[in-house]
Amino acid sequence: MHVVITGASRGIGAELGNRYRAEGHRVTGTGRRGGGDLVALDVMRPESVADFAAHLGGRAVDLLVCNAGIYPDKGQELDGGYPAPMWAETFATNVTGVFLTVQSLLPNLRAAGGARIAIISSQMASHTRAPGGSYIYRASKAAALNLGRNLAADLAPEGIAVGIYHPGWVRTDMGGDAAEIGVGEAAEGLIARFDALDMEETGCFRTWDGREYPY
């Protein structure tokens, strides 16, 4: 199986890559600057996405994990915070970057036959559970959830399944030291969810440990 993971330089993405390699799968991991085993991909830049697609050429992609994301508005105040450039950068990464990556790799996904797309969103995407704050990140992850649901509808006739996942509150640079679980537990759970993703599950919004999460 050929697995492509965006945002694989650290945290959950890096752990997913390590585990898939340990299982004997072929992994193409990406990072903004590349280097080492990573291929350069800045999902904010359409030309970078196009270059990455050209790098893959005609190679089939069995599983695409859209993991690249940012959370720059943590701790911002409603009065005077959340500047416009922060909105633009976050949506360019967390939403547009996901779409452009999927769009550019459609030929590779189609070549695999029965490919799967996993979009890493967040529990903060939920419209049902909205406690306030982190407006930019919440809005971007809600948009990514909506994007994934609609991709699932459009790609279903081609047999490409799409799942959207909350990876847990994970001890990473983004999640912080007070988070509930480590990257190992998150990656193990996510891999189990990706393995279970099929056409009956397409469009699902699930947590790393298998629970359905409210939209």
Task: Describe the residue ranges of each PLM region.
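N-terminal Rossmann NAD(P)H-binding glycine-rich loop of SDR-like oxidoreductase domains
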Residues: S9-N18
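Rossmann-fold cofactor-recognition segment
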Residues: G34-E47
